[in-house]
Amino acid sequence: MDMTGERRIVAPRQVVWDALNDTVTLKASIPGCESLEKTGGNQMKATAAVKLGPISARFNGAVTLSDIDAPNSYTITGEGQGGVAGFAKGGAKVFLSDDSGATLLKYEVKAQVGGKLAQLGARLIDATAKQMAEQFFTKFSAEVEKLAGLAEAAPGRAGIVAGGGF
């Protein structure tokens, strides 16, 4: 499955970049995310509960950031095992650019599922992936815009206020 999209976030690029590298912000934004912890370098481990059609699964996996060009772009890749439900793996290239006082975030996603999940069919998988992406970006935008407001209210505290960054 391939998916592309973009989102305009009303916050400076550096604040968006910091949030994309902050485990607290990401955990709050990822649908079903139960835990997200930095394990070293640009590595994280994650647990997420996902419902895809009739199948519910808890995925445990690893996430890696690469091709890092701060504060412009990176690639995030991950792979998770969902027990008898199967597996999911994929990645996203994320690009940031300035957009009239805001930040334009563009993404290109490639993902693959296997096991019982793969038997659900491309239409259901694609629809669920698009819904989860929309939920993520809605929450992420709200979190970042809240952080941007805090940074403006307390100059010198720009960046992630919540902590947990890389």
PLM regions: where:
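Hydrophobic ligand-binding cavity/cleft-lining segments
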Residues: 1-43, 51, 160-162, 166
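Short, surface-exposed coil-to-beta transition loops
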Residues: 4, 58-62, 88-92
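Hydrophobic pocket/interface hotspot
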Residues: 16-20, 26, 65, 107, ...
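Glycine-rich portal/gate segments that line the openings of hydrophobic small-molecule binding cavities
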Residues: 38-79
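Beta-strand/loop substructures that line and gate deep hydrophobic ligand-binding cavities in soluble
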Residues: 67, 80-127
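A conserved amphipathic terminal alpha-helix motif
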Residues: 116-153
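Charge-rich (especially acidic), low-complexity segments
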Residues: 146-166
